[in-house]
Design a protein with these regions (language model features):
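Hydrophobic alpha-helical membrane-insertion segments
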Residues: 19-20, 80
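Metal-dependent polysaccharide deacetylase catalytic core of the NodB/CE4 family, i.e.
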Residues: 26-118
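Active-site metal-binding loops of divalent metal-dependent hydrolases
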Residues: 9-12, 72
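Hydrophobic "anchor" residues on beta-strands that sit immediately upstream
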Residues: 6-7, 67
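A generic structural signal for alpha-helix starts
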Residues: 11-14, 84
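N-terminal pre-catalytic segment of deacetylase/amide-hydrolase enzymes
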Residues: 1-6, 14-18, 25, 48-58
Length: 118
């Protein structure tokens, strides 16, 4: 029996370059959950570890053999948003990613794993 496991990486950070290199080397695939509204953005994990996001236009070739999934435009806490903003965050991100990567985006990952029942 074949065994399957899923690898997913969030936010499109510069570290993805190395992950993709290793995945490609060993013939493995992963899902990359991206935010189209936070390109070339730095944020600090626990106020001390800088995390830099890549410019998405620079990643089209990098992610060529992997799944791209939506992760909202700006990585908000979705449980705090009104319904109209939830729809905008998800819909605009999906459309932006499909336009940039020229393929259908089917997956979605909730930022911070917090969501609303709306």
């Amino acid at each position: 029996m074949d065994k399957i496991f899923l690898l997913s990486f969030d936010d499109g950070t510069v570290w993805d370059r190395r992950f993709v290199e290793l995945l490609n080397k060993y013939g493995m695939k992963a899902t990359f959950n991206l935010n189209s509204g936070l390109e070339d953005f730095i944020w600090y994990y626990e106020d001390r570890f800088p995390i830099r996001r890549q410019k998405l236009a620079d990643t089209v070739e990098q992610y060529r053999f992997h799944e791209i999934a939506s992760h909202t435009l700006t990585h908000p806490y979705m449980s705090e948003l009104p319904e109209w903003e939830l729809m905008r965050q998800m819909g605009d991100d999906k459309r932006n990613l499909e336009s940039l990567f020229c393929r259908e985006v089917k997956g979605f990952a909730v930022p911070f794993s917090y969501y609303s029942d709306l």
